[in-house]
């Protein structure tokens, strides 16, 4: 299981990376391994507003449907359209398969660093 040091995490296993005023979101390697094979993903639309700690997307695997919680508040400026056609890429590379990018207005107060997240995943 890979846990990157340069991103922050929510307890619900989403990762968040900040690049200037843009936030990038995806799910952790731990999350994708627990989900099983991903078969469908529903993302917000460009222009949508997402709110920290609220559901903003869904991932369907062979096991169940999972709500994705936003680790930030802001306006969606880009989605990873490749995942809409090939959601299995999430299983192949959880950190390379970002879901969407947001122009940041705020971050969740529940974000944790890699060290704390490792403890959660044990």
Curated annotation (Swiss-Prot):
Origin superkingdom: Bacteria
Name recorded for this polypeptide: Glycine cleavage system H protein
InterPro entries: 2-oxoA_DH_lipoyl-BS (IPR003016), Biotin_lipoyl (IPR000089), GCV_H (IPR002930), GCV_H/Fam206 (IPR033753), GCV_H_sub (IPR017453), Single_hybrid_motif (IPR011053)
Residues covered by the Lipoyl-binding domain: 22-103
Alphabetized NCBIfam families for the sequence: gcvH, PRK01202.1
Database matches in PANTHER family: GLYCINE CLEAVAGE SYSTEM H PROTEIN (PTHR11715), GLYCINE CLEAVAGE SYSTEM H PROTEIN-RELATED (PTHR11715:SF3)
Family affiliation: Belongs to the GcvH family.
Assembly and binders: The glycine cleavage system is composed of four proteins: P, T, L and H.
A Pfam family reported for this protein in Swiss-Prot or TrEMBL: GCV_H
N6-lipoyllysine PTM positions: 63
GO-annotated biological processes: glycine decarboxylation via glycine cleavage system
Cofactors that this protein relies on: (R)-lipoate
Keywords noted in UniProt: Lipoyl
Cofactor note (record): Binds 1 lipoyl cofactor covalently.
A GO CC term assigned to this protein in UniProt: glycine cleavage complex
PROSITE patterns noted in UniProt: BIOTINYL_LIPOYL, LIPOYL
Function: The glycine cleavage system catalyzes the degradation of glycine. The H protein shuttles the methylamine group of glycine from the P protein to the T protein.
């Amino acid at each position: 299981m890979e846990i990157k040091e340069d991103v922050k995490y929510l307890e619900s296993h989403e990762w968040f990376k900040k690049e200037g005023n843009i936030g990038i979101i995806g799910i952790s390697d731990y999350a994708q391994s627990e989900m099983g094979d991903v078969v469908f993903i529903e993302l917000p639309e460009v222009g949508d507003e997402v709110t920290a700690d609220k559901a903003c997307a869904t991932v369907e695997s062979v096991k169940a449907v999972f709500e994705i919680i936003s680790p930030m508040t802001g306006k969606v400026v880009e989605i990873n359209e490749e995942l809409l056609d090939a959601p299995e890429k999430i299983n192949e590379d959880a950190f390379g398969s970002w879901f969407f990018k947001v122009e940041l207005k705020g971050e969740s107060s529940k974000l944790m660093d890699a060290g704390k997240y490792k403890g959660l995943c044990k």
